[in-house]
Amino acid sequence: MNGNVLLDTTIVVAHFRRDAALTTKLQQAGALYLPLTALGELYYGAYRSQNQAKALAQVHEFFKAVVVLHPGEATADCYGQIKTELAQAGTPIPQNDLWIAALAKEYQLPLAARDDHFKCVQGLNVLNW
């Protein structure tokens, strides 16, 4: 794989836990993008960690290797569309994951994730890494 990829929090956490197969995929990918929402989730996890200093250092180091995507008006529009479609289908997903899916759709990036509920989002290219 050599294409650009948007990373869900689950992928970064697996990388932090030294998932060798995943690390290889990350190394073979093109540009790596991280939603601002996922970065917030990573910081939350680091601050809750028993080894806070090490966890924060991991987040800071990883932050250097990715491009952080920030939500804007177009993201909000995608968010509204996705949330409406999922509500009508009776398949809601967590709030933060709605924002992550919206960024993936807005930027037309495949989303590497380990959460099955992303598959409910129409038109979202989910990579189950």
Language-model-derived ranges and their functions:
Residues T23-L26, F118-G123:
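Short loop/helix-cap segments at secondary-structure boundaries that form the rim of catalytic
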Residues M1-L34, G40, Y44-E61:
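Short, well-structured N-terminal submotif of metal-dependent ribonuclease cores
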Residues D8, L34-P35, P92-P94, D115:
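Histidine- and aromatic-rich ligand-binding microenvironments
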Residues A65, C78, H117-C120:
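Residue-level recognition of specific faces of alpha-helices
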Residues I11-V12, T75, W99-I100, H117-F118:
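Alpha-helix capping/helix-boundary segments
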Residues F16-D19, A113-H117:
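Short, polar loop motifs at secondary-structure junctions
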Residues G3, V67-A112:
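Active-site neighborhoods of divalent-metal-dependent phosphate/nucleic-acid chemistry enzymes
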